[in-house]
Amino acid sequence: MISDELITKNLLASNERIDDLNYKGMVLIQSGDSFRFGTDSVLLSGFVRASKNDHIIDLGAGGGVLSVLIHARTHCKVTAVEVDKLQCGRLVRSAELNGISEYLDIVNADYIKNTDSLGRGRYSCAVCNPPYFRTDCGPVSNRAGATHEECADIYSIARAASDLIKFGGKLFLCFPSQRLAEAICALKQADLEVKRLRPVCSTPSKPPYLCLIEAKKGAKPGIIFDTNLIICDENGEYTAETRRIYHIDGEN
C-alpha cells in the first residue's frame, strides 16, 4: 500500500491518479489528460518471453505499464523511451513509488530519431505497443501520438527496433489483425522474422481483432501460431486465461 505521506510529497498532480496493477503491489500514475493504458498493453506484457538477464527497451513507453509489468514479472533491466515529457515524469514517479527506480532507465526521446544515442545493438529484446491508426483515417485528438501513426508508422518502428536489438534479439509487439500482412512485411524488411503469433478475440464467436507478435532479428522464416487468446466467454465474463493475465484471482 502507498502511504498518504508519499502521495502528498508532490508525487501527484491534481489531474493524476494512482492505479493498482494487481501484481506484486505495482502501481502506475496516470492522467486524465493523456492516453491511459488499455487491455492490449497488459496482454502484450503477458506474451513477452524474457528473463532477468535480458535488457529490454520499451519503445514509446507512454505511462510505462509495459515497463513496470515486464520488470515485475522478469526482474530484468528495462529502458523505457517516451517522447512525451509529462509521461516520462509520471513514469519516473511510478518507478519511485514501486521501488524499482534502479531497474528502470527512463529516457525522454524520440526512439525513431535517436537509435545512435540509445545504443545500436545494445538490447536483447524490444517491446512496443505501437499506434494503430493511420493519420488519414479521420480527425486526430490531442492524444493522437498514442493511437495514431502521427509520429511513427510500423515501417519506421520495425527499422528502429532492428537497429536497437542484437542479432538474434527479439521484438514483441501487438498490432491489429486486419493489418497483419503489413506488419509482417515491415518486419521482414527490417531483418525481423516473425516467429510466433497469437490472435486475440474478444469472445469465442468473434474473429481476432489483434495479434500478439514475436519477431527475431536475423532468423530464418517459420511461424508458430499459438491458440487464440479469448478475452471473454459468450456470457461476457473474463476467461480463466484473461483472469490469470490480469491477476484478478491473485498473483501467479
Kindly give the residue locations of the regions a language model identified.
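SAM/dcSAM-binding transferase cores
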Residues: S205-N252
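Conserved beta-strand segments of alpha/beta enzyme cores
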Residues: V27, K77, Y103-D105, E193-R196
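Class I SAM-dependent transferase core
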Residues: K9-S51
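Residue-level signal for inorganic ion chemistry
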Residues: L44, N129, I157, A215
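Mobile active-site "lid"/loop adjacent to the S-adenosyl-L-methionine
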Residues: P130-S156, A160
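Conserved SAM/SAH cofactor-binding pocket of Class I
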Residues: G46-G119, C125-P139
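Short loop/edge segments at beta-strand edges and connector loops
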Residues: Q30, N108-A109, F175, R198
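Conserved Class I SAM-dependent methyltransferase catalytic core
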Residues: D153-P208
